[in-house]
Amino acid sequence: MPQHKSAEKRVRQSKRRNARNRVHKAEMKKLVKTVKGLIEKSAEKEEVENAYRAAIQKLDRMAVKGYLHKNNASNKKSKLSKLVNRFSKGDAA
């Protein structure tokens, strides 16, 4: 347990930040899974594109806000783009 007031404050801050990070990362994972699920189900192309756009926006926002490193976000976006492009060409993953 923390022995100093400043250490106690850091514990409180880290708990809040950890909870906030978990919420954002869970939402990001949900959006990515949605895109992958739609591709697996061979859904409408427009539906996949909309889900893809939402996922990309979330990844960009997380990188800007610091919840995710920009290179990590870029890597995830690249992988998603490859999947969506393959799907749109007709070679469903």
UniProtKB/Swiss-Prot annotation:
Keyword match Ligase = no
* One CC-aspect GO term: small ribosomal subunit
Which InterPro entries does the annotation name? Answer: Ribosomal_bS20, Ribosomal_bS20_sf
Q: GO molecular function terms here? A: small ribosomal subunit rRNA binding; structural constituent of ribosome
UniProt superkingdom: Bacteria
Q: Which GO terms describe its biological process?
A: translation
Family, per the entry? Belongs to the bacterial ribosomal protein bS20 family.
Q: What does this protein do?
A: Binds directly to 16S ribosomal RNA.
Query: What is the protein name for this chain?
Result: Small ribosomal subunit protein bS20
Organism name: Chloroherpeton thalassium (strain ATCC 35110 / GB-78)
